[in-house]
A protein has these predicted regions:
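Acidic/histidine-rich alpha-helical segments that form the ligand environment
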Residues: 93-142
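Short, contiguous alpha-helical
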Residues: 1-25, 29-37, 41-44, 49-90, ...
């Protein structure tokens, strides 16, 4: 049985993370629809600040987006080896946004996604914790992508 190298494993984690955030123009996908707005970057562009601020099934899209931004920033730090305690309650403190805040969250998500991707490349194989953090952030982001997609679907039903 052929074994996968750690570099290949990190590359695959990055590929799944890419699909979570950007449109990957392949004839196939790992888990998202194969269209430009399937990942976070494109999907969040399809709604405005007012829509993002609506409470849908207990939380807003803005809440999830802020949590994603916060989580990405912390994941990059974790993968790089800084395991200082974090106040995760802070990651849910935003529930509504204005246009400027919504633009900033989306820009920060894009930058933080790249920071996580870079941290995976530079430190993802440096320790069990780093690799676990890399795998964990992929799963975490896939969950929130699905949650936001469901909230948008519910919002558009009404």
């Amino acid at each position: 049985m052929e074994q996968v190298s750690i570099d290949t494993a990190i590359g695959q984690l990055q590929a799944v993370l890419d699909e979570c955030f950007i449109h990957v123009n392949n004839s196939w996908t790992y888990f998202t629809d194969n269209k430009p707005d399937a990942g976070f970057i494109g999907l969040l562009q399809t709604i405005n600040a007012e829509e993002a601020s609506q409470n849908i099934a207990g939380t807003s899209i803005a809440s999830h987006a802020h949590h994603v931004r916060f989580s990405l920033a912390e994941a990059a730090v974790w993968i790089r080896g800084d395991h200082a305690p974090v106040d995760w309650k802070e990651s849910w403190r935003i529930s509504s946004v204005n246009d400027t805040e919504w633009t900033k969250i989306r820009e920060d998500i894009s930058k933080s996604y790249q920071a996580v991707r870079d941290a995976m490349a530079s430190h993802g194989s440096s320790s069990v914790e780093a690799f676990g953090g890399a795998a964990g952030v992929v799963a975490h982001m896939a969950f929130h992508l699905g949650a936001i997609r469901q909230k948008i679907a519910l919002m558009r039903q009404t």
